[in-house]
Structure formats: C-alpha cells, structure tokens
Amino acid sequence: MAPLLAAAMNHAAAHPGLRSHLVGPNNESFSRHHLPSSSPQSSKRRCNLSFTTRSARVGSQNGVQMLSPSEIPQRDWFPSDFTFGAATSAYQIEGAWNEDGKGESNWDHFCHNHPERILDGSNSDIGANSYHMYKTDVRLLKEMGMDAYRFSISWPRILPKGTKEGGINPDGIKYYRNLINLLLENGIEPYVTIFHWDVPQALEEKYGGFLDKSHKSIVEDYTYFAKVCFDNFGDKVKNWLTFNEPQTFTSFSYGTGVFAPGRCSPGLDCAYPTGNSLVEPYTAGHNILLAHAEAVDLYNKHYKRDDTRIGLAFDVMGRVPYGTSFLDKQAEERSWDINLGWFLEPVVRGDYPFSMRSLARERLPFFKDEQKEKLAGSYNMLGLNYYTSRFSKNIDISPNYSPVLNTDDAYASQEVNGPDGKPIGPPMGNPWIYMYPEGLKDLLMIMKNKYGNPPIYITENGIGDVDTKETPLPMEAALNDYKRLDYIQRHIATLKESIDLGSNVQGYFAWSLLDNFEWFAGFTERYGIVYVDRNNNCTRYMKESAKWLKEFNTAKKPSKKILTPA
C-alpha cells in the first residue's frame, strides 16, 4: 500500500467524521470527494428551545443481529461508582460563534474562509445550539439517568484574544458556570475538557498557535487559560482533561491539513500547502505536551483536592498484526507507539517511544531534563477514545521508503481486511468504523500490563450514520438506530470482561450526546444518541440507543426529580 494511503487510513480511523471520503471501506483509494456546498444560510438556522422525546418504540431491529437477553449488559454488572455518561465538545454543539463577547476560533475562521474544505460546505455557527439549549441538554441527560457529562470549554469564549492581556469574557464564565451548576443540581458530574481543538484565531495569527517555534508563548497562554478555568470552575469540577485527542488534532491540522488551520506539505491537497507534514505535527504535539505538563503542575500545586482528578484523553485505534510473521508483529508495536505512545509515554515516563525517536530522528523535538520531570506522572486518570481497530501490516524500513506524513513513521499500513480478505469486524454506518470490541479489551490490557493500570475512562465510543444530500437519512431510520445500540451494548459488555481481567476502567461516555458538526464532515454524519432536527429549530428526539441507556441507567437507581431552572 502506498505510504500516503497508509497514513490516510491511520488518520481516518482515529476519530468520528474523519472519514469516508479519505478511505473507502476496502482501503481502495485516498480521495477527497466534496459534495456541492449548501447555502450559507442552511447552516445558520436559529434553533429554538423546544424539547421532544418519542415515547413509543418505532420499527424493528432492521436486520441487526442483536445480543441475546442474557448477553445484554446490565447496570448491576458494574461497581456502584462506575460512571456512565455522554460526551460533546464546544465547537461541535454550542453555536453562538460570535455572541456575548466570544472571540473567533481557528474553526470559525477555517469554515468561513474555506467552506470547500467541509464536506457539505457547512459550519458550526449554530451547531446544535447548545449555548441556548443547555437546559434542554441537561434535561435529556437526567432523563437518561446519566451519571456524568463530558463537555469542553471554548478557549475563545473565555479569552476572546486567547491571552491574559486580552481579558476574560464574563459572559463566557457565566455560561459554563450555569451549565456546571445545573448539572450538579441534577446529580450529574461534569467532566471538563479544557481544549478540544478550538484555538483562538488571534493566537494563530500572532505566532501560529500550537506551531509556536519558541515552545513558550503557546504554553504560557494555554496555562493561563487553564488557570482561569481552575479559578472559576475548580470549586465545582472534580474531573479535568487538559487535551482531547492530541494525535488526531496534530496529524490532521498540520499533516493532512483537513483540520483547521489546514496546513500540509507542498503537493498535498489542503487549504495551505506551505507547511511540512513530516515536522509540524511533531512541533505542535511537543507544545501540547509541554502545555499539559505546566497545567497539571499548576493544578497540583494550587487546586488539587483528595477527590479531584486530572489527565488527558487519547484517541486510540486498536491494532492487530496482519499476519503471523515477526515483521507484522513489529509493525503492530510501531503502530501502537505512534497511535498511543506518542502522547502517552511522555506523561508516563517523560519521553517519546524509542521506535519514534529512532525513526523520526531530528524531526521529533527533544525534552529538557526539567520538562521530562514535569511530564512523568502528570496525571491521576486517563481518557481513551475508542471506535475501531485495524490490521497492521509491515512496510520494510529501507532507503527506498519515503514518508509523506508524520504517521508514515510507523512503517506500517493499516488494513481493514486481513490476509483472508475478511474485514476486522462488521461495518458500521460510515465506512471507517468496523465493530471490533475485542480491540477495546486489548487496549485496556495494554494499559494494565504495560502502563501500570491507571484509572481509565472510555471518554468516547460510538458510530456515525451517514446523512448527505445524495443519500439522506430519513428521521425514522435515524431514530431506529439499532446498529448503534448493538455497538454500544457490545462495547459495554466488553468493559465488564476487562474489569474481570483486572482492568482499572472506571467509566464510559457515549459519543455523542447529540448529532453535531463533525469537523470536516460537517453535518453529513450523525453520531448522537439524541437526534437533532436542524430543519425544525434543533428539536431533540431520543433515539433507540438513548432509550436503552435510560433503561440501563435507571434499572437499579431511585428516580430523582429533574431540576430545570426557568
């Protein structure tokens, strides 16, 4: 397989929405087929504050082979303090992109200036309108009996210019304070992600955002942002994640260029082909790790309590050797190193994986001794975002191999099909996700056996349903999401198996609470357990998966009154 395709597959399988137009279901091509852009107004409909659920079950199981009754997971399989919740991120759901003092983000800028780089030409100016509908969202979470809600804080909503000098936006503080208070009043624990890919555009223009070559300005500005969050929300929030999916963020923003700010090497297809896809992802990743270490150090010195936790969330695609050869086993290990170890090993032991250092060489920055000391052990919980797995097939390490993207440094292609021609698991909706719950168990065993079995939360897990202009998804079909329900049930059941094997996994968050803006896939994929009708003021409807989670969560719990302030 060509190096570019191998890297594209590695990227495309890392996160929802990054996705079908990068690689086909059989790994047959690397292409970017954009649909005709929608009207700019279509992505700016004002959503109202209505709340709707469907009380009656509709349809059948649509031919999906479900688990037998005895195999369906039950809440009492898990410890009473095991956390079940749902997850979102600020840019994907909030909307209100320029309201109440919010500054412009890199994604606002990217979508407004390069709509051709979004599959349907849309943007998240309105998103799912959660800025105005957060009370409805909390009501939904409570209705489903969720223990927790994972959401992110928009950096430019809090600091419009991204810096201390630019000032704090009091309306941004008020919004998140209101959300956190309402969650707690309803018995829902907030899990807060400080950064989920929305960089203040002012910092992009000032020093290149996370490409800051000084490795200083971005670290200082991010640490100040984290401090503002700790100062204003730390009395209520016990669980913090400094960064979400740094591997996806860096590789897609500065490698393939399909994420804001859209940079890649000359000759590749992106908005700004003036970068270096073999270097810039590593530069940005290095800055992320330095910023994480400083934020955790600050937190531990001034805000930490006995009942608080802090870490970061990794995106992990499971790996299985393509064949039985020693070379394919080595390819699997290199793939784990760049997919997981790139950001995990520095926070565990203070430095990058040995394979990455030997293969990327001078392209991978070096940590100073004092930086290694701050990095090592800079967490007391970790998040894992798991969706699917791939077969890792060896690419010979030789002078004839010319990497194109940073992920080519794994010297391994990521294959959907094994040597027998069969896929790693059943296809799920969009082409990049194949259901393979065993990969989640493999990952948890790696965390147990190799990395000391830290407290783990599955901070994202789910599938997307394709909904495009050419292949629209009827609302009834979207609500009857039995494939998603089966996927969720099987992965929750796998968590029980992993706990029985000694895993320290302590929670599970479905991705996502709501159908939302899926980055460069726009609104062409629906990942929500709750349907958002963008043609009807963003009215919410619980899908079958949400209804089952409601039954699951409330089976062994006393009901509580839903508190929703006027």
Curated annotation (Swiss-Prot):
Optimum temperature is 50 degrees Celsius. Loses activity when is heated at 55 degrees Celsius. InterPro entries: Glyco_hydro_1, Glyco_hydro_1_AS, Glyco_hydro_1_N_CS, Glycoside_hydrolase_SF. Optimum pH is 5.8. Reversibly inhibited by micromolar concentrations of Hg(2+) or Ag(+), but irreversibly inhibited by alkylation in presence of urea. Competitive inhibition by p-nitrophenyl beta-D-thioglucoside (pNPTGlc), glucotetrazole, and para-hydroxy-S-mandelonitrile beta-glucoside (dhurrin). It catalyses: Hydrolysis of terminal, non-reducing beta-D-glucosyl residues with release of beta-D-glucose; DIMBOA beta-D-glucoside + H2O = DIMBOA + D-glucose; DIBOA beta-D-glucoside + H2O = DIBOA + D-glucose. Keywords: Chloroplast, Cytokinin signaling pathway, Disulfide bond, Glycosidase, Hydrolase, Plastid, Transit peptide. A beta-D-glucoside binds at residues 92, 196, 244-245, 387, 460, 511, 518-519, 527. Pfam families: Glyco_hydro_1. It is found in: Plastid, Chloroplast. The keyword Plastid applies. The keyword Chloroplast applies. Residues 1-54 form a transit peptide. Changing residue 460 to Q: Loss of activity. Residues 17-47 are annotated as: Disordered. The active site is at 245 (proton donor), 460 (nucleophile). GO terms for cellular component: chloroplast. Disulfide bonds join 264-270. PROSITE patterns: GLYCOSYL_HYDROL_F1_1, GLYCOSYL_HYDROL_F1_2. Expressed in all seedling parts. Most abundant in the coleoptile. Belongs to the glycosyl hydrolase 1 family. Is implicated in many functions such as ABA metabolism, hydrolysis of conjugated gibberellins, conversion of storage forms of cytokinins to active forms. Also acts in defense of young plant parts against pests via the production of hydroxamic acids from hydroxamic acid glucosides. Enzymatic activity is highly correlated with plant growth. The preferred substrate is DIMBOA-beta-D-glucoside. Hydrolyzes the chromogenic substrate 6-bromo-2-naphthyl-beta-D-glucoside (6BNGlc) and various artificial aryl beta-glucosides. Homo- and heterodimer. This is 4-hydroxy-7-methoxy-3-oxo-3,4-dihydro-2H-1,4-benzoxazin-2-yl glucoside beta-D-glucosidase 1, chloroplastic. It comes from Zea mays. The lineage of its organism: Eukaryota, Viridiplantae, Streptophyta, Embryophyta, Tracheophyta.
